[in-house]
Amino acid sequence: MAKEPLIRVLLIEDDPMVQEVNRMFVEKLSGFTIVGTTATGEEGMVKTRELQPDLILLDIFMPKQDGLSFIKQIREQYIDVDIIAVTAANDTKTIKTLLRYGVMDYLVKPFTFERLKAALTQYEEMFRKMQKEAELSQDSLDEMIKQKQAQANMDDLPKGLHAHTLQQVIERLEELDEPKSAEEIGRDVGLARVTVRRYLNYLESVGQVEMDLTYGSIGRPIQTYKLKQG
């Protein structure tokens, strides 16, 4: 069986220290290879044409040409490359713009290796599926869209909720084998129960989480939560 080709990644980041950390993170993962690095949007455009990467890990806030204008130029010129955005901002305006330009994912600085790993793993699944299948079934499309649903819900968060924290809660819910209470989830992610409950209530309101009541032998029932299936 032929070995699958590595996914070619270009890193565009103006902070040398962050650039090196990102490089080390990506190189920890099988299936990916770094084909180039650059610190500016202008040089990034040159290297994108020259190296023809499959994926760009793109910093949004850079001097001269920032990431948003870089993405706009890429889309206007119909350059065939996917982008994962890296940003210090989690305001809805920036996130809406990134989503409209078709980024595959966005990572809010500072992010963990586990968060980047999750983003790249999801991207690799989509990338391999697109390579193998000339046409996608409805089930395949549904699964891909479902995976991006968590990102889409961050498009318009209520006041006081933050995309990075919401992502933490969602990631913990994805790991659960059985429903858990807000207190248990909060303990797992290092957040107060009342804080976690606000995010769980939001996820329930947008149809992404199911809440159920668990009755013990005494006392009031406990609200437990799990991701909605299907």
UniProtKB/Swiss-Prot annotation:
Q: Name one GO molecular function term.
A: DNA binding
Xref: InterPro entries: 2C-system_Tx_regulators, CheY-like_superfamily, Sig_transdc_resp-reg_cit/mal, Sig_transdc_resp-reg_receiver, WH-like_DNA-bd_sf, WH_DNA-bd_sf
Keywords attached to this Swiss-Prot or TrEMBL record, sorted alphabetically, are: Activator, Cytoplasm, DNA-binding, Phosphoprotein, Transcription, Transcription regulation, Two-component regulatory system
Tell me the compartments it is located in.
Answer: Cytoplasm
Phosphoprotein as UniProt keyword: yes
Q: Where would I find the Response regulatory domain in this sequence? A: 8-124
Residue ranges of the DNA-binding region? Answer: 183-209
CDD domains, from UniProt?
A: REC_citrate_TCS
Its job? Member of the two-component regulatory system DctS/DctR. Essential for expression of DctP.
**What's the name of the protein?**
Probable C4-dicarboxylate response regulator DctR
Provide the gene name from the record: dctR
